Amino acid sequence: MAPDGKRFVYRTFGPDGDGLKIMNIETNAVAMLTKGYDNFPLWSPRGDLIMFSRLAEGDYDIYTIKPDGTGLKRVTHSHGNDAHQAWSPDGEQIVVASSRMGFKDEGVYTDAPQPYGELFVMRSDGTDVRQLTDNQWEDGTPAWQPAGK
């Protein structure tokens, strides 16, 4: 949902095309934002960017794009899958679930799913990356605590 509450972004897969779309809640008008295997779209707290995960070069990486469809930028360049991202309340940082560190043997032997692996925090432009978790199981779907709570 856009911070103004008037639009939302969602992914679509199907015969009409794959990608992200934006719908105006008041008019039901729909606009195609991206084309491709894009997923997990999230509006920035300031409303100026939409962050999403895109399948490119065999792995998922995090991208941002302006709501008008301009300014596409690749944020992560890992050799693993990056997804399940979340904005910090001020929009200055993101947290991402990633398999960039590889998989642990324990998951292979126990049939435990490890599609993403560990959590990483970074600036919203992809710099200053810090690993937050390191364990034998998957850590994923992070969420920030709301500001001031």
Q: Where are the model-predicted features located?
A:
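Blade-level signature of beta-propeller repeat domains, shared across WD40, Kelch, NHL, RCC1
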Residues: 114-115, 126-149
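Short loop/turn segments that connect beta-strands within beta-propeller blades
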Residues: 24-28, 66-70, 123-127
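Conserved beta-strand position repeated once per blade in WD40 beta-propeller domains
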Residues: 40-42, 84-86, 141
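Hydrophobic beta-strand positions that form the internal "hydrophobic ladder"
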Residues: 5-8, 47-51, 75, 94-95, ...
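A flexible loop/linker signature enriched in serine peptidases of the S9 family
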Residues: 11-20, 34-35, 53-63, 67, ...
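A structural motif specific to WD40 beta-propellers
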Residues: 31, 72-73, 129-130
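Residue-level detector of Asp-centered blade-edge/turn motifs that repeat once per structural unit
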Residues: 3-4, 45-46, 89-90, 146
